[in-house]
């Protein structure tokens, strides 16, 4: 069945006609050879499958037979492929139609731009731009080609070398700056700055003076009091800008900081009762202002402040001991300054009178 389908598809396209007996005979011979080769190939495949199914334990004899049958089947199919690949001979030939001169769509213009940039001296630096455009010749195009404006590199700002030399020698510029309406000079000069490296930061190279401010970024402000006076604010002093510790900029500032010196004194006293509100009394009066739970203890910690004299900074906190619930740990913080508070109160009272 497979061979008949192959042969019908092969012979249907270009078989012989009644007017050409020689061509028809040649085509018939090719069909016969193709049919025989295809039948031999299919028969070889059937034999190959049969041998593989029979030989459960392959031996040398069975291997030889399988190899021979495989070679026959492969050669038969190669012959079929070669017969099918031959150029067909006969009256059925194809002719190429003449190429159509009209294109079904318009071609968009192709734009090729070649830009060459040459850097020369700062005084004569320029950009050379070359553009090559190929447009479609048939009719005008509805699309406009966008050509960007060439970018010209401008030379750096030129400076007066004589003024720079006079500034280095005399310490001040010889040229008088322009005057404002109030008569105070105020100029801003832009100068090229050296490249800033990773070790030389902007903050480390900043220098602030009362008369002028110079920064490594190339800006020079003359008489900053006039600039800051426009906003109604006084100029910043140099002392306010030098409060930062400059000993080690990479690490933390290790300058001495003032902290509240609190003297703590811890004592253990027996509890008066099992209630937390009952604390042993001493020579001062105390008022509770809060409590805080303690991790690992069922009893909270109470915080008290001295209420003997108003404004006394003395504090204490009371908590029960972990080893003995009938013992209290009292921690005192701060000193009593009742005399100082009384003197201040008396002075204020006298002033009011």
From Swiss-Prot:
Induction: By salicylic acid and strongly during leaf senescence.
Tree of life domain: Eukaryota
Tissues with expression: In young, mature and senescent leaves.
DNA-binding region(s), chain positions: 275-341
Comp. bias intervals (Low complexity): 158-176
Keywords associated with the record: DNA-binding, Nucleus, Transcription, Transcription regulation
Molecular-function GO terms, alphabetical: calmodulin binding; DNA-binding transcription factor activity; transcription cis-regulatory region binding
Main location: nucleus
UniProt keyword Phosphoprotein, yes or no: no
Region (Disordered): 117-259
Chain intervals with Polar residues compositional bias: 184-204, 213-229
One GO cellular component term: nucleus
A family per Pfam: Plant_zn_clust
Subcellular location: Nucleus
PROSITE patterns the record matches: WRKY
Coiled-coil positions: none
Function of the protein: Transcription factor. Interacts specifically with the W box (5'-(T)TGAC[CT]-3'), a frequently occurring elicitor-responsive cis-acting element.
Family, per entry: Belongs to the WRKY group II-d family.
Name the UniProt record assigns to this protein: Probable WRKY transcription factor 7
């Amino acid at each position: 069945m497979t061979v008949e389908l192959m042969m019908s598809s092969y012979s249907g396209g270009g078989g012989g006609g009644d007017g050409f007996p020689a061509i028809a005979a040649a085509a018939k011979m090719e069909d016969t050879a193709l049919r025989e080769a295809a039948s031999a190939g299919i028969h070889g495949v059937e034999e190959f499958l049969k041998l593989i199914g029979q030989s459960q334990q392959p031996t040398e004899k069975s291997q030889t037979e399988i190899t021979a049958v495989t070679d026959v089947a492969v050669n038969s199919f190669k012959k079929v492929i070669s017969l099918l690949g031959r150029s067909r001979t006969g009256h059925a030939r194809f002719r190429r139609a003449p190429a159509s001169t009209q294109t079904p769509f318009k071609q968009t213009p192709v734009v090729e731009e070649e830009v060459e940039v040459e850097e020369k001296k700062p005084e004569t630096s320029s950009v050379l731009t070359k553009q090559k455009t190929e447009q479609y010749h048939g009719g005008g195009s509805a699309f406009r080609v966008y050509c960007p404006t060439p970018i010209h590199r401008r030379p750096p700002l030129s400076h007066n070398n004589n003024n720079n030399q006079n500034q280095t020698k005399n310490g001040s510029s010889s040229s008088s700056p322009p005057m404002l309406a109030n008569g105070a000079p105020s100029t801003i000069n832009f100068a090229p700055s050296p490249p800033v490296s990773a070790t030389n930061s902007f903050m480390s190279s900043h220098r602030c003076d009362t008369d002028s401010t110079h920064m490594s970024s190339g800006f020079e402000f003359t008489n900053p009091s006039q600039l800051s006076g426009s906003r109604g604010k006084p100029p910043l002093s140099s002392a306010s800008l030098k409060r930062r510790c400059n000993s080690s900029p990479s690490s933390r500032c290790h300058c001495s900081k003032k902290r509240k010196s609190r003297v703590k004194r811890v004592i253990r006293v027996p509890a008066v009762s099992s209630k937390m509100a009952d604390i042993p009394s001493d020579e001062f009066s105390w008022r509770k202002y809060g409590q805080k739970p303690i991790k690992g203890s069922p009893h909270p910690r109470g915080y008290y402040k001295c209420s003997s004299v108003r404004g006394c900074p003395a504090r204490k906190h009371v908590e029960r001991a972990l080893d003995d619930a009938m013992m209290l740990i009292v921690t005192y913080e701060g000193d009593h300054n009742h005399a100082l508070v009384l003197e201040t109160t008396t002075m204020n009272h006298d002033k009011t009178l």
